[in-house]
Amino acid sequence: DAKIDAALFTSYHCINYYSDFLFCYFGRRYGFVVTPDAATSISAGIDGGQPARRTFGGNVTYTDWQKDNYFHAVRTLTGGVKRLGIEFDHINIDTLNLLKSEFPGMEFVDIAAPSMRLRMIKSAEEIAHITQMTRIADIGGAACVEATKVGTPEHEVALHSTATMVREIAKTWPHGELLDTWTWFQSGLNTDGAHNPVTSRKIEKGDILSLNCFPMVAGYY
């Protein structure tokens, strides 16, 4: 509908969803360029060959020897493109200005909302994957209950839950990546905020407890 020639995804969620590459930012730019003929991730040299080995599509790795190497990579993948889709809700002003400077004849079109709508439509394979994730989350919850006792610190409960989920993920997907699985566990006053961090507070009798288990595989939880 947007009549774009290609798309440059830059966000964690879109790059991970469309390429299965969960990058680690550390001040470097990443991307996933999709054209009618190819899908290619753009990664920094610090990642070595991991993006090429583990992710969907092709891969271009750029070095830090020159500051504009990222944009050179984008240029090599978007030759002849007049209308490029980008994520307006993710690209900051600095990057947008650099894109406009590097590609003066290119028109940039917002594809943030359309790409989100595409991610909302789940395939049968995705549904099967999510079903496995809920099973593993239940295992993490049971481990949390197992570890919860008066006098036990929050972090010990969370660690037991997380370790149990990681082991089950490794068993379920022997060749998968084990990254970012975690547990939110709060007790007592610490339950007053949904996103309060885990602390070393010890559980007391009569405490309200809050639990969220996040088994993370391929960007799903």
Task: Give the location of each predicted region.
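A composition/biophysics-driven feature that prefers long, compositionally simple stretches
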Residues: 1-140, 198
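Glycine-centered loop/turn motif at secondary-structure junctions
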Residues: 3, 103, 151, 169-170
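Short catalytic-site patches enriched in acidic/histidine residues
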Residues: 15-26, 112-117, 121, 154-221
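Short, structural beta-strand-to-alpha-helix junction motif
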Residues: 91-93, 149, 153-157
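Secondary-structure edge/capping motif, primarily at the C-terminal ends of alpha-helices
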Residues: 144-148
